[in-house]
Every structure is written in structure tokens, then in C-alpha cells.
């Protein structure tokens, strides 16, 4: 018990040397006695086994007033407001600028609602010749076939009269008939070609194109009658 009471008394009332000794020393100023005297009177009032800290707490409003009154010295620049810790008061930072595309790249066009603009597909000439009649019967294609000319009865009658007198037409006569019957020169030419083929078939005449090709392939057919004729004259 005696030892514990001694320790408690030493903690509660610490003993310091007299102030005169500190005043005589060279490393302490004149404020030593006042400092230690005030500390003994106010700070060292303990309630328990352990000493109380010397930290003096200040009220929140007083600390805020002192913090607002003190301003750092600057070169005429106003101090910016402290950042707010609330998300509602924070200012929205501007978004970074979009990168500029290079010359070889084209930016993709977008609609106002965010959907990409659909560009028309490129159709090449060789793509138009695809047979799509089975898929879409209304599609005529890029190069539709020429429709057959439907001759009227009056036109056919006039062409038959001309064919009866002349099976082959000259260029001038063909142009005259085309202007008279309101037809093209090509239509007159095709009609006469078809009519001659029909006439040869009706009269069972050989085709002139086939005969000329066969004679060109066998040139000895023309020389044989000539040799035979010479032989007869010699006799």
C-alpha cells in the first residue's frame, strides 16, 4: 500500500526543481518561471492515475472563424474556394474534345438519336446481271432484253408488197420504207432477213451461207468441171 500510494502521489503532483535554478541557467529565458508556474496552476489538474494531455480543444465555430480570417500572402491572386465534398455542389467538368480524324478516315455519320445512318450500297454493273427474277419477278434488271416488235397489219402488208418486188433492199430504199411505216431502219432490215429465210424454206432452196462455206472448204469442186471441159475440147 505504501508503494502504490507513493506512485499515485508522484503522478498526481510531480515535483520540479525550484524556478530559481532555471532562471540562473543560460539556456532558459525570462519566461521560464511564468511558463512553469502557469503550467503547475492550470494544466496539472489530474483526476486519476494518468496525467492529462496539454492539448487545448477549441470549439468548431472558433476554428472555422480563425481559418477564414487567415489568408496566405500571394501576388494579388484571389484564393479559390475550397472544393465541396457534396456531389450536388460539384461543378461538371467539360468533356474532352473529340480527336480529329485523319485524311484517310471518314467519321461515321450518326443520327440525332444515336442510330448510325445507313449509307446506300454501291451497285456495280456486273452486279446488275444477276438473275433475280425468281426472287423478285418485278425486277427487270439493269439491262432488260429488247421486246419483239409487234407489226401492225398495215405495216406487214406494205412490207410484203415490197418483198414481192425486191427481196433485197438498198440503203436508200430501206430508209424510205422506215420513214413511211414509222419504223426504224434496223426493224426493216431484220424483217427482210426473216422473210427471206422463210421464203427459202418454203421453196426448199439451199442456204446461201452454207453453200458458200462448203465451197470455200473444198476449192477442187470448181476446178473439176474446167478440167473436164478442156478434155472435151481436145477430143
Swiss-Prot record:
One of its GO terms (cellular component) is nucleoplasm. Keywords: Developmental protein, DNA-binding, Homeobox, Nucleus, Transcription, Transcription regulation. Residues 66-93, 202-235 are annotated as: Disordered. The gene is HOXD4. CDD domains: homeodomain. Sequence-specific transcription factor which is part of a developmental regulatory system that provides cells with specific positional identities on the anterior-posterior axis. Binds to sites in the 5'-flanking sequence of its coding region with various affinities. The consensus sequences of the high and low affinity binding sites are 5'-TAATGA[CG]-3' and 5'-CTAATTTT-3'. The keyword DNA-binding applies. Belongs to the Antp homeobox family. Deformed subfamily. The keyword Transcription applies. It comes from Gallus gallus (Chicken). Residues 225-235 have a biased composition (Basic and acidic residues). Residues 209-221 have a biased composition (Polar residues). PROSITE patterns: ANTENNAPEDIA (PS00032), HOMEOBOX_1 (PS00027), HOMEOBOX_2 (PS50071). It holds the Pfam family Homeodomain. A motif (Antp-type hexapeptide) lies at residues 123-128. It is found in: Nucleus. SUPFAM superfamilies: Homeodomain-like. This is Homeobox protein Hox-D4. Its main location: nucleus.
